């Protein structure tokens, strides 16, 4: 009872067509479709851009990790330094 029925939607549709005309409605539909297409394209480009930035960051982190000495080497250096201090 409180909802909009099929007949009410049909009457609203007829009134809209009479007010705007079919040519304007087609134009509005085309403009709306173009806007949606552009929006989807922009989102896809943004996602592609983000994924390439993530790939660049991953490769940079790998390079940084390659430059850092391993824990074993650090521990060996610390032991050698402490032995040298003990000798001195």
UniProtKB/Swiss-Prot annotation:
It comes from the Bacteria. The chain crosses the membrane at residues 1-21. It holds the Pfam family TatA_B_E. One of its GO terms (biological process) is protein transport by the Tat complex. Keywords: Cell inner membrane, Cell membrane, Membrane, Protein transport, Translocation, Transmembrane, Transmembrane helix, Transport. GO terms for cellular component: TAT protein transport complex. The keyword Transmembrane helix applies. InterPro entries: TatA/B/E, TatA/E. Its main location: membrane. It is a single-pass membrane protein. This is Sec-independent protein translocase protein TatA. It comes from Psychromonas ingrahamii (strain DSM 17664 / CCUG 51855 / 37). The gene is tatA.
